[in-house]
Regions:
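Intrinsically disordered, low-complexity proline/glycine-rich segments
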Residues: 2-104
Length: 104
């Protein structure tokens, strides 16, 4: 009788783990600053994985650090896509609609 319960727990753990790692999206940005037609993302802007918590050093948009690919989100994820034409310190600028890695 223990075996089915253990199997169920294993399946549930794998399902939760897979769901936590689903890619996400940046859902907000600076309404007045567009990058390739999309609002520029900044620290504090929201994603489906929580807020962006890490941005470019020394580059601010409306008083907030600009978000770039590789920046962290609240749940341990990262921004993983961005502009193909705008770079900050060699990293693509992140924008509303760009992808995140999902939570860790």
């Amino acid at each position: 009788m223990q075996k089915p319960l253990l199997s169920l727990i294993t399946v549930m753990a794998l399902t939760v783990s897979a769901a936590a790692q689903q890619p996400g999206k940046i859902t907000s940005g600076a309404t007045g600053v567009m990058v390739d037609g999309k609002p520029a993302a900044r620290v504090g802007d929201t994603t489906t994985d929580g807020k962006i918590i890490e941005g470019a050093k020394g580059v601010y948009i409306n008083g907030k650090p600009a978000a770039v690919v590789g920046g962290s989100t609240e749940c341990g994820g990262k921004t993983i896509s961005g502009s193909t034409g705008v770079f900050i310190n060699g990293k693509p600028m992140a924008r509303a609609g760009d992808s995140t890695s999902g939570c860790k």
